[in-house]
């Protein structure tokens, strides 16, 4: 009688499915990041609104941690010097004249303009 059992080793698992899934995941993440950048770049992202009537209307960087900021308050516009340690009032301006509401553009017209600029229309 033959009491010897033969052990068969299975074929090594290939890395192709792992690479395929990893590639698809990286492509999806890149697509999400590109869409977020495009939304921010084209202005579809909601505008940041200030709290309690404060709105930053302009900002300029002067150094690594220094900025000059123009803040609209209810009855004045303040020019502030902002550093890492403190905020100083540089100048007080009269309130700005009310501006006309900028009409919201729809997605279709933005895409048409974008395609016209790239020459694909």
Curated annotation (Swiss-Prot):
GO biological process, one term: chemotaxis
Disulfide bonds: none
Gene (name only): fliO
Top-level taxon: Bacteria
Keywords: Bacterial flagellum, Cell membrane, Chemotaxis, Flagellar rotation, Membrane, Transmembrane, Transmembrane helix
Family: Belongs to the FliO/MopB family.
Entry protein name: Flagellar protein FliO
Matches recorded under PANTHER family: FLAGELLAR PROTEIN FLIO (PTHR38766:SF1)
The species this protein was found in: Escherichia coli (strain K12)
An example Gene Ontology CC term for this record: bacterial-type flagellum
